[in-house]
Curated annotation (Swiss-Prot):
GO terms for cellular component: mitochondrial inner membrane; respiratory chain complex IV. Its EC number is 7.1.1.9. It is a multi-pass membrane protein. One of its GO terms (molecular function) is cytochrome-c oxidase activity. O2 binds at Y244. This is Cytochrome c oxidase subunit 1. Keywords: Calcium, Copper, Electron transport, Heme, Iron, Magnesium, Membrane, Metal-binding, Mitochondrion, Mitochondrion inner membrane, Respiratory chain, Sodium, Translocase, Transmembrane, Transmembrane helix, Transport. Fe(II)-heme a binds at H61, H378. It comes from Loxodonta africana.
Length: 515
């Protein structure tokens, strides 16, 4: 029965599909918010209203894209679908908890949307810093609803993380060691550990904010001996690992795509890739204060956070050059998924370079809260995480659905999206360098030209999103079935056919060890 299958599902493939659909829908909402932002900024002067409504839209855009698009698709969608198949497990370790992890997200989304419907909305930015998020600057229920939304999304992610860690460690065949796992499995394992360690700190921080707002505590209020800087430390101790949570599964997917379409049986430097991801995961926890260079830290503290942040470039560089080495000498197949992966490598590297610039505390003091920062993190998210999702989706779509996409349309869509995102975010570097601040709905006329270019780019990206929807419709309408898959011996998720049966591995998978 339909309701039983989809509401009470304990099947990793069905839950993965639910995550993908939910993430796609949230992605539409988040895209709509971003179009509103760029429409407002396309010309000087006011379009939608004051800065409060503008910042409510910015905040909603961030939360929707992070917690309801990237994480559900990468970890929930691809993770649920692929991890059990890749390690030969019959399902996830805790199938019913898996179901709950998903069904906590729609109520969480509902609370977030409710927060913008009551009072003036939560116009705090996704960081929700007090005192702006306190009960004077944001009277009413908006910020409280946002906090509850974050709590639900956080519980969902923590349960999901426990589930993935248990599944990956405990449900491999006896012959498969840690170092025989595909890189995507590694990336999800490391991501899950990061979630498990960072989310409780966020929960503590926003719970203290909640009591400051409603129960008259003064954790973040200097009048009662509190300190708003404490909130920033708690938030960014979560917030920085979070950005690595958003990109690590993308690293895993790109490794698979680049290896597959280079005709290689394994990625270059497997162990280097694994250790690079583990290093990134570890270092991600000890650099959080580089988001706070402007709050007045000691010079030696700033020196530490500058150098620690720069060290992350080393394992990241290991990954980039290993991808290039995987490509080297390969029989390269220019499929759309490969194009997304190559676009990922190039644009993520550019985003990484601007990150190195911002790691310098002296430079960051000038660039902090300008559009240079916006350009930086959108290069690594809008062209890193999103490109990885697009490449992964196109690569594994035949596995999920049993049908193939039209490759010509897929290549056109890639080209449109590539032009759109670059036209949107490249000019923002110039705006930032000339001092245009973030989180304002209006700006001096001097900034008009680059803002107009940026807004044009966002509308091109919108066309690409619509093209994507059309491509998926076209694939299901045409029903071109998958004829044959290549390289299945080193891509075990394809071994059970396209799509795989509802229950795979009803008896334990036999894995022969080559080492």
């Amino acid at each position: 029965m339909f309701a039983n299958r989809w509401l009470y599902s304990t099947n990793h493939k069905d839950i993965g599909t639910l995550y993908l659909l939910f993430g796609a829908w949230a992605g539409m909402v988040g895209t709509a918010f971003s179009i509103l932002i760029r429409a407002e900024l396309g010309q000087p002067g006011s379009l939608l209203g004051d800065d409060q409504i503008y910042n409510v839209i910015v905040t909603a855009h961030a939360f929707v894209m992070i917690f309801f698009m990237v994480m559900p698709i990468m970890i929930g969608g691809f993770g649920n679908w692929l991890i059990p198949l890749m390690i030969g497990a019959p399902d996830m370790a805790f199938p019913r908890m898996n179901n709950m992890s998903f069904w906590l997200l729609p109520p969480s989304f509902l609370l977030l949307l409710a927060s913008s419907m009551v009072e003036a909305g939560a116009g705090t930015g996704w960081t929700v810093y007090p005192p702006l998020a306190g009960n004077l600057a944001h009277a009413g229920a908006s910020v409280d609803l946002t906090i509850f939304s974050l709590h639900l999304a956080g519980v969902s992610s923590i349960l999901s993380a426990i589930n993935f860690i248990t599944t990956i460690i405990n449900m491999k065949p006896p012959a498969m060691s840690q170092y025989h796992m595909p890189l995507f499995v590694w990336s999800i394992l490391i991501t899950a550990v990061l979630l498990l360690l960072s989310l409780p700190v966020l929960a503590a921080g926003i719970t203290m904010l909640l009591t400051d707002r409603n129960l008259n505590t003064t954790f973040f209020d200097p009048a009662g001996g509190g300190d708003p800087i404490l909130y920033q430390h708690l938030f960014w101790f979560f917030g920085h690992p979070e950005v690595y949570i958003l990109i690590l599964p993308g690293f895993g997917m790109v490794s698979h795509i680049v290896t597959y379409y280079s005709g290689k049986k394994e990625p270059f430097g497997y162990m280097g890739m694994v250790w690079a991801m583990m290093s990134i995961g570890f270092l991600g926890f000890i650099v959080w204060a580089h988001h706070m260079f402007t709050v007045g830290m000691d010079v030696d503290t700033r020196a530490y956070f500058t150098s620690a942040t720069m060290i992350i470039a080393i394992p990241t560089g290991v990954k980039v050059f290993s991808w290039l080495a995987t490509l080297h000498g390969g029989n390269i197949k220019w499929s759309p998924a490969m194009m997304w992966a190559l676009g990922f490598i190039f644009l993520f590297t550019i985003g990484g370079l601007t990150g190195i610039v911002l790691a310098n505390s002296s430079l960051d003091i000038v660039l902090h809260d300008t559009y240079y920062v916006v350009a930086h993190f959108h290069y690594v998210l809008s062209m890193g995480a999103v490109f990885a999702i697009m490449g992964g989706f196109i690569h594994w779509f035949p596995l999920f659905s049993g049908y193939t996409l039209n490759y010509t349309w897929a290549k056109i869509q890639f080209l449109v999206m590539f032009i759109g995102v670059n036209l949107t975010f490249f000019p923002q570097h110039f705006l930032g360098l000339s001092g245009m601040p973030r989180r304002y709905s209006d700006y001096p006329d001097a900034y008009t030209a680059w803002n107009t270019a940026s807004s044009m780019g966002s509308f091109i990206s919108l066309v690409a999103v619509i093209l994507m929807v059309f491509m998926i419709w076209e694939a299901f309408a045409s029903k071109r079935e998958v004829s044959v898959m290549e390289l299945t011996t080193t891509n075990v998720e394809w071994l059970n056919g396209c799509p795989p049966p509802h229950h795979t591995f009803e008896e334990p998978a036999y894995v022969k060890s080559n080492s």
